C-alpha cells in the first residue's frame, strides 16, 4: 500500500509537470485535480508526507525503468478468442417463448420454452491483460446444437466492461436454470469472463439468486 502510494505520487508529479507546460487537455487536467484530492486523502490515512512519498516513488520508477527493455514497454495487443465457428455465429434462430432484457449496453435474449436441457455458453471475444476486453457475441447451445440464448452488444450503446459481461451472463444463466436446465460455461469464458464456475464448468448459483435473475428477465 505504501509503495503504491509512493508511485502514484511520483506519477502525479510527472503529469503535473506535463500540465505546467500547457500540454494537457481538459479531461487530463480534470483527472489531475481529482487525483490530487485523492492523494491527499490517502496521505492522511497512511500518515505519509506527499513530497517524501514522491521522492521514494521516483526511486521505485527509476529502478523499474532500468530493468525494462524497449520490447517490454510496448502495449500488449489484444487477442481474439473463438468458442464459436462462423456458422454458429451467423446462424439465425428463433424463440418459442422469447424473453429479452437490456443490461447496460448489452442485449440478453433467451427462449424460456426450453426445459430440462444441458446448455453450454460459448462466446467470441477480445482479451487484453488476461481479462475480457470486448464481447463480440455470446450464445447458449443445447447438446443438439440448437441456439436458445444470446448476449450481444447494442450498436446504439457502444462500450462495456468485463463486469458488465459477467452480470449479463449471470442474468442469462439465472433465466435458463429457472426452467431446470443445466448450464455450463466454456473454458475460455470461465478463464476470462465468468471466473466463478466450479471445476466442471457449471456456475454455482444459489436458488434465491436464480429466482432474482429470472424475475429480472421477466420484468
Swiss-Prot record:
The dsRNA-binding region is required for suppression of RNA silencing. This is Non-structural protein 1. Pfam families: Flu_NS1. Keywords: Eukaryotic host gene expression shutoff by virus, Host cytoplasm, Host gene expression shutoff by virus, Host mRNA suppression by virus, Host nucleus, Host-virus interaction, Inhibition of host innate immune response by virus, Inhibition of host interferon signaling pathway by virus, Inhibition of host PKR by virus, Inhibition of host pre-mRNA processing by virus, Inhibition of host RIG-I by virus, Inhibition of host RLR pathway by virus, Interferon antiviral system evasion, RNA-binding, Ubl conjugation, Viral immunoevasion. Its main location: host cell. Belongs to the influenza A viruses NS1 family. The lineage of its organism: Viruses, Riboviria, Orthornavirae, Negarnaviricota, Polyploviricotina. It comes from Influenza A virus (strain A/Goose/Guangxi/345/2005 H5N1 genotype G). A motif (Nuclear localization signal) lies at residues 30-34. It is found in: Host nucleus; Host cytoplasm. Upon interferon induction, ISGylated via host HERC5; this results in the impairment of NS1 interaction with RNA targets due to its inability to form homodimers and to interact with host EIF2AK2/PKR. A motif (Nuclear export signal) lies at residues 128-137. One of its GO terms (biological process) is symbiont-mediated suppression of host gene expression. GO terms for molecular function: protein serine/threonine kinase inhibitor activity; RNA binding. The keyword Ubl conjugation applies. GO terms for cellular component: host cell cytoplasm; host cell nucleus.
Amino acid at each position: 500500500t505504501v509503495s503504491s502510494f509512493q508511485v502514484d505520487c511520483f506519477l502525479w508529479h510527472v503529469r503535473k509537470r506535463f500540465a505546467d507546460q500547457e500540454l494537457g487537455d481538459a479531461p487530463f487536467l480534470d483527472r489531475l485535480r481529482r487525483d490530487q484530492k485523492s492523494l491527499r486523502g490517502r496521505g492522511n490515512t497512511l500518515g505519509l508526507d506527499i513530497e517524501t512519498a514522491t521522492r521514494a516513488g521516483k526511486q521505485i520508477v527509476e529502478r523499474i525503468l532500468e530493468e525494462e527493455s524497449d520490447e517490454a514497454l510496448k502495449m500488449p495487443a489484444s487477442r481474439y478468442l473463438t468458442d464459436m465457428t462462423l456458422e454458429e455465429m451467423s446462424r439465425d434462430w428463433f424463440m418459442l417463448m422469447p424473453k429479452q432484457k437490456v443490461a447496460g449496453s448489452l442485449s440478453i435474449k433467451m427462449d424460456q420454452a426450453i426445459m430440462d436441457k444441458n446448455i453450454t455458453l460459448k462466446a467470441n471475444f477480445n482479451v487484453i491483460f488476461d481479462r475480457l476486453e470486448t464481447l463480440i457475441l455470446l450464445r447458449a447451445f443445447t447438446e443438439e446444437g440448437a441456439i436458445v440464448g444470446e448476449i450481444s452488444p447494442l450498436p446504439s450503446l457502444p462500450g462495456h466492461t468485463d463486469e458488465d459481461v459477467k452480470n449479463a451472463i449471470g442474468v442469462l444463466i439465472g433465466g435458463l436454470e429457472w426452467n431446470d436446465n443445466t448450464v455450463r460455461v466454456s473454458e475460455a469464458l470461465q478463464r476470462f469472463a465468468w471466473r466463478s464456475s466450479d471445476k466442471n464448468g457449471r456456475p454455482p448459483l444459489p436458488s434465491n439468486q436464480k429466482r432474482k435473475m429470472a424475475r429480472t428477465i421477466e420484468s
